[in-house]
Amino acid sequence: MLASSRQPRHAFVEHHHQLSSSTLHRSGSPQTGTLRQDATTPTLATSVGPSMDRSASDYSQSGLPSPYPSNCGDNQSEAQSVTVDTSSAAQYNASAQQEVRSNNPGNYSASATPTSEYGVYPASARSSSFPDHLQQRSYHPASNHSGSSGDPSIAAPSPTYGAPAQYSPYGPPSQDMSHGYAHPGSNLYAQPRPDWSGYGQQHGAPLTPGHHVFPQTPTSAPPQARPNQVYSFVPIPGAQQHKRPRRRYEEIERMYKCGWQGCEKAYGTLNHLNAHVTMQSHGQKRTPEEFKEIRKEWKARKKEEEAARKADEERQRQAAQSQGGSTEGQAGSDVSQSSNGYAGARGAVQLPPIGYQAGQYPAATSTSVQQQPLPDYNASYMQGYQPASPYGGSNQAMYNQR
């Protein structure tokens, strides 16, 4: 039995291997049968000592299994622990495990993952009434600064991930905070965000990653002074005064005639005539010298027409002034009479000011409008007003006073 139980330690320590109580009952090996008999019979606990080197890792916790869930316990010890019913675990002797650990130190290979039975306090030092979850919480450090703990029950961080940062999660960040997340192959946050440009970098630390960093260009800053340039593609009415206005069809003075083989076409500009000549193949293009005499005649005729028009306008203006002089005299007399009549009528219909009181302003000298009943109406209204009986005889007397 001793020879068969001396097996390599690493064959029974696996992360994903979990034994159940059913496998303990169903296994036909003499070792597991002895273990089941040991768990149920306390008198044979000492005879199972040599066989416990195989199943020592199955009972990961050296004390009683706690009914409370562990807050800080690692998942490896939970995965390796065997779900033994409480009746058999309560009768298990804790000294047998301690004896197995002291007698068989060479069976634990260095490559095997350590279990959680290496606690800070030995099994004999803790009382049976001490809660196991409080004991497990005691040796878990609050913050792991070095990346590997002294307690073998806590697994070291995987080498594929970087070591944790060297600052407290609630303390002020260190100088390497500004480039702690910058990787050489990523340009995602190489340039600061535009919305955060006003705040600057943390603690004034410059960005020193392995890639290029572009200068910070805050968008919230006022734009640079630009020259007053107006980029308008819509023609401004006052900007193109040098161009002549387009004339209507009946207003065109057609002085440029074609004359090619009896062609009667005439145009208002030489450019339009040359377009006609080119399109219709009516000879060579015309030159301004050909129409020099025609233009002189046209200008002279234009001047005569302009002079005649101005003379006609002047004559009409003088006639209007002569007629306006006689009418202005009559209008002046009418205006004086109407102004006097308006003044008298205005005095008759003039209303008193807002703060009018009897005797403060002289009454208007007019018989058509009487302003005297206004204060009497106020006095009678205030005297005869009774809230209890608004339809009483006093109100009727007030209306009868008029």
Swiss-Prot record:
A single GO BP: regulation of DNA-templated transcription
Residue numbers spanned by region Disordered: 1-247, 302-402
Low complexity bias (residue ranges): 87-98
An MF annotation (GO) of this entry: zinc ion binding
Compartments, record wording: Nucleus
Zinc finger annotations (C2H2-type) as residue ranges: 256-282
Function per UniProt: Transcription factor that plays a central role in appressorium formation and pathogenicity. Required for the expression of a large set of genes including factors that might play a role in membrane metabolism and ergosterol biosynthesis, the chitin-binding protein CBP1,as well as CHS7 that is essential for normal pathogenic development.
Protein name: C2H2 finger domain transcription factor CON7
